């Protein structure tokens, strides 16, 4: 239907923006944050001094990551609202139904990723850095 096709174009644009932002986000994690976490773990295991970090404290990039997580959470709440809870209209084609199903699965996986980082990885990393900074 025309409505379904207009919805598909709108949803596709929102998802495309999300993927673009998430790619940049993942690059920051993979190139900046996670290598430093690795260095912290290595320093802890080898009982060596904490290496210098160009961002100062790990809290700086973590606060950026968490703000970006919040932005994505808002974006997917908006997508969920626009798609009526990822529910296709009665007259929607099967392709659009499949897109919504996959979009919902993606959102759930993203939500899990955000939960693990915000509630486990980031707090533990901040604590580890603080303990390592206390060592002589």
Regions from the language model: what does each represent?
Residues 2, 15-16, 103-104:
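Short amphipathic alpha-helical surface micro-motifs
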Residues 2-8:
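Short, small-residue-biased leader/transition segments that mark boundaries at the very start
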Residues 10-22, 26:
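Long, amphipathic alpha-helical coupling/dimerization segments that relay conformational signals between
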Residues 22, 33, 121:
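Short, structured motif recognition centered on aromatic/hydrophobic residues
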Residues 26-38:
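Conserved alpha-helical segments that form or flank metal/cofactor-binding pockets of metalloenzymes
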Residues 37-38, 42-136:
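Long amphipathic all-alpha helical oligomerization modules
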């Amino acid at each position: 239907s025309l409505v379904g096709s207009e919805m598909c174009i709108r949803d596709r644009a929102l998802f495309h923006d999300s993927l673009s932002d998430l790619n940049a986000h993942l690059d920051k994690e993979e190139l900046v944050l996670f290598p430093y976490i690795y260095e912290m773990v290595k320093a802890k295991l080898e009982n060596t001094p904490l290496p210098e970090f160009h961002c100062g404290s790990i809290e700086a990039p973590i606060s950026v990551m968490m703000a970006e997580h919040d932005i994505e959470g808002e974006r997917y709440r908006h997508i969920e609202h626009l798609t009526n809870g990822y529910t296709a209209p009665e007259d929607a084609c099967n392709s659009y139904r499949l897109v919504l199903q996959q979009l919902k699965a993606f959102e759930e996986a993203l939500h899990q990723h955000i939960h693990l980082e915000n509630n486990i990885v980031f707090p533990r990393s901040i604590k580890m850095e603080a303990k390592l900074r206390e060592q002589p």
